[in-house]
UniProtKB/Swiss-Prot annotation:
Keywords: Hydrolase, Metal-binding, Nuclease, Target cell cytoplasm, Toxin, Virulence, Zinc. Residues 88-377 are annotated as: CT domain, sufficient to interact with CdiI. It comes from Escherichia coli O157:H7 (strain EC869). It is found in: Target cell, Target cell cytoplasm. The keyword Metal-binding applies. The lineage of its organism: Bacteria, Pseudomonadati, Pseudomonadota, Gammaproteobacteria, Enterobacterales. Gene3D superfamilies: 3.40.1350.110, 6.10.140.1810. This is Deoxyribonuclease CdiA-o11. GO terms for molecular function: deoxyribonuclease I activity; metal ion binding; toxin activity. The active site is at 257, 278, 289, 291.
Length: 377
């Protein structure tokens, strides 16, 4: 997808093509001051690559004629239009077929089944597209699905002035159900940076990012600002948790583990020293690994990428877990529907470190592991 995005950008203008290198260079200077490009670790290069892709995609949107030009090529747009759940035209056709059938008094279940099958077949492609090309799903698929959904909400009186409207409340309900499901799927499963790229490449939003022309430094700053935002789901006091940062597992890790357990069933806790996971809720089939990372150590402040590496290691362990038994408690992969990591970090975590945390969260999604972050102050 990186190559697809950059190719669109480079086709828009020679300037944007050459600007991609500057985007990366500026990102390196902002995130890793004093570090030469040749000295970047592989994971640091991945971070820069992601930022450059977001920024370059945004730049492409500024030089192109539409949001789609920033995200995907014309062919991918064509494919999306031809292969989507129920589009505007499909919704109208379904509405007409169902309305005519009801008026004739026939058995209309075959019509409903036919269109549900079409919707399901086209919707099934979204799962793979969210893995292979999430930016296309955000830019084009979402708009087509939304078009079909919006058709159900057009008031009937518009039909009196020549505007096409749906007339069957039954058909509207089906389209809302089918397309609403796909819209939710796209929103929930799209990587966060693609949502930023779509937002930033919209002409109505570009005024906030560009003044007097294409300003590469502003675009890069915007991308970094988005990626480095604080995404903690909660903030708690250290005294409430009973933990002390930098004081070892007994005063940092264990108190946090106990705190997380307060919101889980009493029998969810696994035996001490259980492999990978600390809790298992049989009712929800959720296995939870409780972790805490002190981001304020000299090593992690000097090299924020260590934060990503630590979380990634925890994610990989949770994703690859197969089975384990200890003290009469057994846990197997077949018992697990949800794998989660409850992560605690200091409230003083830097923006650069947050960029690494957010990258790890997105990586977790790709591995089927949900990472929830709580900051402890």
């Amino acid at each position: 997808m990186v190559n697809a995005t950059l190719s669109v950008v480079q086709k828009n203008s020679a300037f944007v093509g050459s600007a991609t290198g500057e985007l990366a260079a500026r990102a390196i200077g902002m995130l890793y001051p004093g570090v030469k490009q040749s000295d970047l670790s592989e994971e640091q290069k991945q971070t820069i690559s992601t930022l450059a892709t977001v920024s370059a995609g945004l730049a492409g949107g500024l030089t192109g004629s539409s949001t789609a030009s920033a995200a995907v090529g014309a062919q991918s747009g064509k494919n999306a239009v031809e292969n989507n759940y129920l589009s505007t035209n499909q919704s109208l056709t379904f509405d007409k077929e169902l309305s005519d059938c009801r008026k004739s008094g026939g058995n209309c279940q075959d019509i409903i089944d036919k269109w549900e099958k079409i919707s399901d077949e086209q919707s099934a492609e979204i799962d793979q597209k969210l893995k292979d090309n999430p930016l296309e799903a955000q830019v084009i698929d979402k708009e087509v699905a939304k078009g079909g959904y919006d058709m159900t909400q057009r008031p009937g009186w518009l039909g009196n002035i020549g505007v096409e409207v749906m007339t069957s409340d039954e058909a509207k309900a089906y389209v809302q159900k089918w397309n609403g499901r796909d819209l939710t799927k796209i929103d929930v499963n799209s990587p966060e940076w693609t949502k930023f790229a779509v937002f930033a490449s919209d002409p109505e939003n570009q005024a906030m990012l560009v003044s007097g022309g294409l300003l590469v430094k502003d675009i890069t700053k915007a991308a970094i600002s988005f990626m480095s935002r604080n995404t903690a789901t909660a903030t708690v006091n250290a005294s409430e948790v009973g933990m002390q940062w930098g004081q070892g597992n007994m005063k940092q890790g264990m108190p946090w583990e106990d705190y997380v357990g307060k919101s889980l069933p009493a029998d969810a806790r696994l035996p001490k020293n259980f492999k990978i996971f600390d809790y298992y809720d049989g009712a929800t089939k959720t296995a939870t690994s409780v972790k805490s990372i002190d981001t304020q150590t000299m090593a992690k402040l000097a090299n924020p990428n260590q934060v990503y590496s630590s979380i990634k290691g925890n994610i990989d362990a949770a994703a690859k877990f197969k089975e384990y038994a200890l003290s009469g408690r057994e846990l197997t992969s077949s018992m697990i529907s949800n794998r989660e990591i409850q992560l605690a970090i200091p409230a003083d975590t830097t923006k650069t470190q947050w960029a690494e945390i957010n990258r790890a969260i997105e990586y977790g999604k790709s591995q089927g592991v949900k990472v929830t972050v709580t900051q402890v102050k």
